[in-house]
């Protein structure tokens, strides 16, 4: 009977949440801060499900979380008819609920009312600081201009925001970063890219209210970098990423004048707009060095502490599979003083080649009322996960909202997954939180009680 009920509950969870589960790991608190996995959908934990998803594809290279929704951009998905006998390979944006992993209706991407079918046309997707989701395509070393679009997150329609010039240095561009307001209505905007197999970086700037973007290096569109870490590196190699630093304490928080660059053979290093290295992994414990071939980094703040998350290995990493480190930065936000908190997932997302995409996407959203950070982790062709980080996550000794096993503030199918993992012994939550029917034991009857709570709430 127990096995039957757990199987039935798992079937319900799978149906409702696109077969997402939790990673089954227990992460020890550090400095009173906890991390719990809300859900995970990947090759390692859901090996019969994730590989069948349409967003498990080497053309689905980047993803972003925005306002509680995950957007996964896949180029050239299907043939769309634009005229009799004429088709284009239309791009699609797949959407998931960030709280549960449940699939939402996908968006067929259009431009000027027609199917959008550019080669790697949605290669890079992200969001600005004002909730606008943007899309920028791959461009080759023969292409001089870069179109930048905003995405209507309800219809899939693209709107051309600007066309950026590469100037005299024309290199291949893969992945981009945007800080500020891409519409320039509420703030300035800065856009950056590091060219592929060159030492060139691009930067474009527009003041609030400005019509056009200009060169972001004192008027210049690009800059040649001469300092790398490790010092033996001479260019960014393949698929580098840039991440500009948001500084809420500054009078110009969206200036992005400090930024990380993470290249194929280099590790994340912090630069300024003169091209000088401000900080690097030189003084970091060698055990925390990321391996070559994986590119991805992000920052966040919590409990007046400054954190960084960075990719530590590709799919073929030594003992790793598409994982990341979360570290607290040292005094003055120094890399050399970093303290490791956790490796996520503790086991793996997957160990399957992504065809050379190399990018590893991270971004966060803040729940200021609960002092909780939601972290989204996406590795192309291997999987994705959502984590809650804070002092009040993970099911404390005293129960909070009845049924909120993972303490993310809502009661839904992700809590059923968490409870099942508790019963199976693959996750640790307080008994007081998991004893839904208050009979003094935690077992399959609590799963039934929790499902009834969810159904009643819906």
Q: Which role does the model predict for each range below?
A:
Residues 88-101, 144-156, 199-208, 268-270, ...:
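Beta-propeller blade signature
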Residues 9, 13, 17, 392-458:
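Cellulosome-associated attachment modules in secreted, modular CAZymes
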Residues 24-48, 103-113, 157-168, 211-230, ...:
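Beta-propeller fold detector
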Residues 266, 280-344:
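Loop/turn-rich, solvent-exposed surfaces of beta-rich toroidal or solenoidal domains
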Residues 47-66, 113-126, 135-140, 166-195, ...:
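Signature of short aromatic-glycine-proline-rich micro-motifs recurring in repeat-based ectodomains
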Residues 69-72, 132-134, 186-192, 252-261, ...:
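Conserved beta-propeller blade signature
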């Amino acid at each position: 009977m127990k096995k039957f009920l757990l199987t039935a509950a798992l079937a319900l969870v799978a149906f409702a949440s696109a077969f997402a589960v939790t990673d089954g790991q227990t992460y020890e608190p550090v400095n009173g801060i906890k991390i719990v996995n809300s859900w995970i959908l990947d090759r390692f934990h859901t090996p019969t499900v994730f590989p069948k998803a349409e967003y498990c594809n080497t053309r689905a290279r980047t993803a972003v979380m925005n306002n509680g929704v995950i957007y996964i951009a896949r180029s050239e998905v299907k043939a769309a008819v634009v005229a009799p006998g004429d088709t284009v390979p239309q791009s699609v944006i797949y959407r998931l609920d960030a709280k549960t992993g449940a699939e939402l209706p996908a968006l067929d991407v259009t431009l000027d009312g027609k199917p959008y079918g550019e080669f790697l046309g949605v290669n890079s997707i992200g969001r600005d600081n004002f909730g606008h989701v943007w899309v920028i395509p791959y461009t080759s070393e023969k292409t001089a201009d870069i179109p930048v679009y905003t995405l209507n997150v309800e219809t899939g329609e693209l709107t051309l925001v600007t066309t950026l010039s590469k100037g005299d240095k024309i290199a291949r561009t893969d992945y981009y970063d945007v800080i500020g307001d891409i519409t320039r209505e509420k703030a300035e905007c800065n856009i950056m890219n590091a060219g592929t197999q060159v030492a060139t970086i691009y930067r474009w700037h527009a003041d609030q209210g400005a019509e056009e973007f200009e060169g972001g290096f004192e008027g210049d569109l690009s800059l040649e970098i001469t300092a790398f870490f490790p010092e033996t590196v001479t260019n960014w190699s393949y698929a580098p990423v840039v991440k500009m630093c948001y500084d809420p304490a500054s009078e110009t928080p969206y200036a992005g004048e400090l930024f990380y660059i993470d290249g194929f053979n280099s590790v994340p290093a912090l630069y300024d707009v003169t091209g000088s290295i401000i900080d690097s992994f030189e003084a970091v414990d060698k055990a925390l060095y990321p391996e070559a071939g994986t590119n991805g980094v992000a920052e966040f703040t919590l409990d007046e502490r400054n954190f960084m998350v960075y990719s530590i290995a590709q799919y073929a990493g030594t003992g790793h599979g598409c994982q990341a480190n979360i570290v607290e930065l040292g005094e003055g936000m120094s890399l050399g003083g970093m303290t490791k908190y956790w490796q996520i997932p503790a086991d793996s997302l997957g160990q399957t080649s992504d065809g050379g995409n190399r990018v590893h996407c991270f971004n966060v959203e803040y729940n200021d009322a609960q002092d909780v950070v939601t972290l989204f982790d996406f590795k192309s062709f291997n999987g994705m996960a959502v984590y809650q980080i804070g002092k009040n996550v993970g099911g404390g000794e005293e129960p909070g909202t009845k049924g909120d096993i993972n303490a993310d503030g809502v009661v839904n199918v992700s809590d059923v997954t968490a409870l099942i993992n508790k019963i199976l012994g693959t996750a640790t939550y307080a008994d007081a939180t998991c004893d839904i029917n208050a009979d003094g034991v935690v077992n399959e009857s609590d799963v039934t009680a929790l499902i009834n709570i969810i159904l009643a709430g819906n």
